[in-house]
Amino acid sequence: MTDLIPLEQAHCLPRKGSDHKLGEARLTELLPQVPGWELAEAGMALTRTFRFADYYRTLAFVNALAWIAHREDHHPDLGVHYDRVVVRYSTHDVGGLSENDFICAAKTAQLYDQGITA
């Protein structure tokens, strides 16, 4: 991936095998580009909790996120609650985090920041 375009404008590419697993140096470079997201599971996953006023807005966000996930062919694990969604990205095919996780994290944050569900 090129760092010349913002992550939220990039698109996911098929990534398989440990060659695509991000190392510590690359994780350190990419994490500041997705504010609010945290490394979890010893750097094997990327997580963030998004909060909403009610269940309707929570589910509207989940449905919009499902469309992004389908379009990018990269799907998060979701914990859906009345007023929040916990989003977790990891690339199973590489055994950890890939650039696809950061691309989708940026797209997810952009969706939330745009107030699509407000």
Curated annotation (Swiss-Prot):
* GO MF: 4-alpha-hydroxytetrahydrobiopterin dehydratase activity
Q: Which GO terms describe its biological process?
A: tetrahydrobiopterin biosynthetic process
- Keyword Lyase in annotation: yes
Keyword Coiled coil on entry:
no
| EC number assigned by the record | 4.2.1.96
SUPFAM superfamilies in the record: PCD-like (SSF55248)
Please provide the record's keywords in A-Z order.
Lyase
Q: Which Gene3D superfamilies match?
A: Transcriptional coactivator/pterin dehydratase
The enzyme's first-digit EC class, named in words, is lyase
Catalytic reaction equation(s): (4aS,6R)-4a-hydroxy-L-erythro-5,6,7,8-tetrahydrobiopterin = (6R)-L-erythro-6,7-dihydrobiopterin + H2O
Pfam families documented for this protein? Pterin_4a
Q: What parts of the sequence cross the membrane?
A: none
Report the CDD domains cross-referenced here: PCD_DCoH_subfamily_a (cd00913)
What PANTHER family would the database entry show?
PTERIN-4-ALPHA-CARBINOLAMINE DEHYDRATASE
Tell me the protein family, please: Belongs to the pterin-4-alpha-carbinolamine dehydratase family.
Q: What is this protein called?
A: Putative pterin-4-alpha-carbinolamine dehydratase
Q: Which organism is it from?
A: Xanthomonas euvesicatoria pv. vesicatoria (strain 85-10)
Per the UniProt record, the lineage of the source organism begins with:
Bacteria, Pseudomonadati, Pseudomonadota, Gammaproteobacteria, Lysobacterales
